[in-house]
Each structure stands twice: as C-alpha cells, then as structure tokens.
C-alpha cells in the first residue's frame, strides 16, 4: 500500500491530505474519509479514519483522508492559532458544517480528478459523519456512505428522508456524543435502504475496534460497487 501526501485547493486555501492506494490495482474505486471536529480528535490521523483508509486501500480502493482548513498543515483564513481555535469553537457551538462541506467537496473533486472514476463512496466519523451525509445528498456520483458515531442529538436528519442511497450507521452503545434514544429517533427520519449497527461495550472513540468498523464500511462499499 502506498500513502501519498497530497495538496489541493479549497476556497482559496491549500489543504493537505493523504491518498492511500494499492499500486497494483489499475482501476480502483474511490472513497473520501471525513474526519471529526478538530476539538474532538478531528484530524486525518484519527484512529478511526486511518483504519478506514488502510483497510479500503488494501481492498482495491483509493482513499483520501484530509485535514479541514486550519487543521494540521491545512491553511486557514485566520491570522493565528488563537483565531483558528475560536473559529472551530464557533463552528462547534453553532453546529455549522458549511465550510467543512466546502472543504470535503474540494477533496472529493481532487480525488475524482486524480483517479478518474465516477465510482465514489464516502465515510465520516462524528462531525465528519454529518459532513459526509450532506455531501452524499448533494453529489449524485456517491453510491453509498458510512456514517460513524453520527451526532443524532445535535443534527436534524430529515434531509435524509428522500435519500435512496445505501447507508450504514455505526454507533457505540456508550457514546457521549449521542444516546441510543437519540439514535433511534434520528433513524426514523431516514429512508431505506439503511443499516444500523450498534457496537456493544464501546464508546465514542472505538479503541481496538477500528478494524472492525473499517470492515463494516468495506462490506457496504463492496456490495454497492457494481455499475
């Protein structure tokens, strides 16, 4: 497996990412991986995101994980670290994904141009799960998505009421970010086809469960990869 550090432009900013792929696969499927909020472990080296990238790349996908603006070495429009912190704190307080969706869209456009395929998938974790879901609704080329630790209690899921794409929701039974009651209520707004997978004796961070989660996403993507 090759991991290639790449850069792409988003809203006038240079963002960083890591493209993972098997050089022996000539026509890979592609998958974009959206990390969580930077104040909650959210960069492209997050344990869940890196596991997804590795497992997918080892199974015929080219995956791109990336850092949102102001995270890691990705540029921002703020002048210093304190301003970047306040920027992301305001996003967390307002549950505002708009800039992150712009960055994820730019990442997807880069990935699509780099690999030259329309066979696309997306996965996101926590805050990134919401970004991935919103991008899935907006982008007709995305075949299916995996949403991990979706913060059901903070975001309205009715925008998925007409989404007919295959959807996987992985949730922990002891997740501080959302309760099982909130998961159940949120799932009621989401159309079929959908899969809810609740992982027992697990919390929001999925320590030692990363490979299991990645394989769940892989199965969903593989089962929906045929033209």
What are these regions (language model features)?
Residues 1-7:
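A domain-start/cap signature at the N-terminus of enzymes
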Residues 8-117:
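Serine-hydrolase catalytic machinery in alpha/beta-hydrolase-like enzymes
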Residues 173-178, 204-205:
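Acidic catalytic loop of the alpha/beta-hydrolase fold
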Residues 202-214:
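Catalytic histidine-centered segment of alpha/beta-hydrolase-like enzymes
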Residues 110, 216-227:
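C-terminal alpha-helix
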Residues 99-164:
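Primarily recognizes the serine-hydrolase "nucleophile elbow" in alpha/beta-hydrolase
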Residues 163-164, 168-171, 175:
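Short beta-strand/loop motif that positions the catalytic acidic residue
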Residues 189-205:
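Catalytic histidine neighborhood in serine/cysteine hydrolases
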């Amino acid at each position: 497996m090759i991991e290639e550090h790449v850069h792409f432009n988003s809203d006038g900013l240079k963002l960083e990412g890591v493209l993972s792929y098997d050089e022996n696969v000539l026509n890979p499927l592609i998958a974009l991986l959206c990390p969580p909020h930077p104040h909650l472990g959210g960069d492209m080296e997050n344990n869940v995101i890196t596991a997804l990238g590795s497992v997918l790349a080892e199974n015929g996908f080219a995956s791109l994980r990336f850092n949102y603006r102001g995270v890691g070495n990705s540029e921002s429009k703020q002048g210093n670290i304190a301003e970047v912190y306040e920027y992301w704190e305001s996003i967390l307080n307002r549950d505002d994904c708009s800039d992150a969706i712009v960055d994820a869209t730019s990442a997807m456009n880069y990935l699509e141009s780099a690999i030259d395929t329309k066979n696309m998938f997306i996965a996101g974790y926590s805050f990134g799960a919401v970004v991935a879901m919103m991008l899935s609704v907006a982008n007709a080329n995305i075949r299916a998505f995996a949403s991990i630790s979706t913060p059901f209690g903070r975001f309205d899921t009715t925008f998925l009421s007409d989404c007919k794409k295959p959807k996987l929701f992985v949730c922990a039974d002891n997740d501080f970010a959302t309760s099982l009651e909130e998961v159940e209520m949120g799932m009621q707004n989401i159309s079929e086809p959908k899969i809810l997978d609740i992982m027992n004796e697990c919390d929001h961070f999925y320590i030692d469960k990363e490979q299991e989660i990645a394989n769940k996403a892989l199965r969903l993507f593989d089962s929906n990869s045929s033209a």
